[in-house]
Structures are given as structure tokens and as C-alpha cells.
Curated annotation (Swiss-Prot):
Cross-link annotation Glycyl lysine isopeptide (Lys-Gly) (interchain with G-Cter in ubiquitin), location: 48
Organism of provenance: Hordeum vulgare
Protein name per its UniProtKB record: Ubiquitin-ribosomal protein eS31z fusion protein
Glycosyltransferase in keyword set: no
GO molecular function: mRNA binding; structural constituent of ribosome; zinc ion binding
């Protein structure tokens, strides 16, 4: 029977084989026609690499089937050296979750039961109601919009 072998260059070779022929025999015939040594040849059919000891019938290769010839690659990527770090890894800041943290922004008067705000609220329309400004030693600062009020310095 006749089979086709497509090479890397796109050239198609026709080979006269029998279904009982081994893959070794096919590789030898390719060497006769193309001059590529069998140890460098890899034959692929239906997405599978053909093993040397098996026959064409094992892979269900019939007349006028096309095998793909690719060359065997040697070696691989260069092995990389593992990095050694001189300093220990920096610890990430962990956010502390405080339950009912909102209560520290308000104070309830015991006598009247009136609620007063302990922090200044941001007047910017982008921030909206309930956005408090941070108290620093010399200023009030809104973390949302960046608005800053600086205290008057006494000379």
C-alpha cells in the first residue's frame, strides 16, 4: 500500500509499505529518500507519536494515510539558579477589625440622652453625610476627598 509522509519543509514523500511493516522500517525508508537518520525522526499520525517497535496496523494506518515527520529536539531550557534574599520578607500590615467602631465617633450625654459628634464631618458634596475627617495634631483631614483644615498657629 502507499502512504504519504509530510516533511518539515512541507514536501510530501510517497512510500510503498505494508500494514505489517514496523515504524523502524518506515523510518529507514525515509532515511533512504531524505537522508535524515532514524534516531532524529519523529513520526506523528492522528496527533500521536509513533513508537519504533510497533507496526502500521497497530496505529490503524491504512492506504493513502498521511504521516507527519518532525525532528527530535535535544536539550531544553537553561536551568535557573534559585534566588537568595539577604533581608527577611517585610511583614504585611494587617487591618484590625474593631466591632462597633462607629461608636467611638459619637458621645451620648448621660443626663439628656443627646448624641454629639466627636469628629468633624466633611462638608464636601462628593463625600456625603457620615464621612468623618481624621483628627491630626495640627489639622483635620478627609481621607476620601483630601480636604484639609489646618489649625490656627498661636505665635
Amino acid at each position: 500500500m502507499q502512504i504519504f509522509v509530510k516533511t518539515l519543509t512541507g514536501k510530501t514523500i510517497t512510500l510503498e509499505v505494508e500494514s505489517s511493516d514496523t515504524i523502524d522500517n518506515v523510518k529507514a525508508k525515509i532515511q533512504d529518500k531524505e537522508g535524515i537518520p532514524p534516531d532524529q525522526q519523529r513520526l506523528i499520525f492522528a496527533g500521536k507519536q509513533l513508537e519504533d517497535g510497533r507496526t502500521l496496523a497497530d496505529y490503524n494506518i491504512q492506504k493513502e494515510s498521511t504521516l507527519h515527520l518532525v525532528l527530535r529536539l535535544r536539550g531544553g531550557a537553561k536551568k535557573r539558579k534559585k534566588k537568595t534574599y539577604t533581608k527577611p520578607k517585610k511583614q504585611k500590615h494587617k487591618h484590625k477589625k474593631v466591632k462597633l467602631a462607629v461608636l467611638q465617633f459619637y458621645k451620648v450625654d448621660d443626663a439628656t440622652g443627646k448624641v454629639t459628634r466627636l469628629r468633624k464631618e466633611c462638608p464636601n458634596a462628593d463625600c456625603g453625610a457620615g464621612t468623618f475627617m481624621a483628627n491630626h495634631f495640627d489639622r483635620h483631614y478627609c481621607g476620601k476627598c483630601g480636604l484639609t483644615y489646618v489649625y490656627n498657629q498661636k505665635a
